[in-house]
């Protein structure tokens, strides 16, 4: 199974984290009252109300995550949803789409960092329900300022417009992190000027998570 097939095999297109390498997602058959069905780990996790964000945050991934959040709310609006995160970050607008949906749906969203939650993914980690933002002990959290994804060309006025948008995005991110952590906007602004790496303990002290897990 190649990377494209693996991505298609996962529910909602949620493929494994990291570059598009060959990766086999195990599947097996289960017998039900309706007959035999083929399942994979992502299906089983979803049935347990677990969403696994193990890729860069793209528009397609955001759509898949939002669909799962809305579907799980429709199935039971009172049961907690868990979101496991191992992501290098990605699109800011894709992140805000997930962020707003997390705040829109009725169930509490538990967030758990496995490995890394960087950039946009760190904001999603911190956006979980208070008291339910968790991390495994050796995970890493990275926060930093938004950046342009590619070289910018064009007229000076166009570049000025883009700069204004980046500053707007930065202020929005600062407010999101300040709300989640209890840190002042001024402190957040200072800290994200450069890459700020945090251990699980450092993320807890900073207010990005609430506790460190020793087992799941």
UniProtKB/Swiss-Prot annotation:
Listed EC numbers: 3.4.21.92
Keyword set includes Protease: yes
Active-site residue numbers: 119 (nucleophile), 144
Catalytic activity from the UniProt record: Hydrolysis of proteins to small peptides in the presence of ATP and magnesium. alpha-casein is the usual test substrate. In the absence of ATP, only oligopeptides shorter than five residues are hydrolyzed (such as succinyl-Leu-Tyr-|-NHMec, and Leu-Tyr-Leu-|-Tyr-Trp, in which cleavage of the -Tyr-|-Leu- and -Tyr-|-Trp bonds also occurs)
Stored PROSITE patterns: CLP_PROTEASE_HIS, CLP_PROTEASE_SER
Keyword presence, Protease: yes
Gene Ontology CC, one term: cytoplasm
Top-level class of the enzyme under EC nomenclature: hydrolase
Domain of life per record: Bacteria
Example of a GO MF term: ATP-dependent peptidase activity
Main location: cytoplasm
GO biological process: protein quality control for misfolded or incompletely synthesized proteins
Localisation per UniProt entry: Cytoplasm
SUPFAM superfamilies reported for this sequence: ClpP/crotonase
Gene3D superfamilies listed in its UniProt record: 2-enoyl-CoA Hydratase, Chain A, domain 1
InterPro entries: ClpP (IPR001907), ClpP/crotonase-like_dom_sf (IPR029045), ClpP/TepA (IPR023562), ClpP_His_AS (IPR033135), ClpP_Ser_AS (IPR018215)
Keywords linked to the UniProt accession: Cytoplasm, Hydrolase, Protease, Serine protease
HAMAP family, sorted: ClpP
Subunit organization: Fourteen ClpP subunits assemble into 2 heptameric rings which stack back to back to give a disk-like structure with a central cavity, resembling the structure of eukaryotic proteasomes.
Family in the record: Belongs to the peptidase S14 family.
Function of the molecule: Cleaves peptides in various proteins in a process that requires ATP hydrolysis. Has a chymotrypsin-like activity. Plays a major role in the degradation of misfolded proteins.
Protein name (database record): ATP-dependent Clp protease proteolytic subunit 1
Lineage: Bacteria, Bacillati, Actinomycetota, Actinomycetes, Propionibacteriales
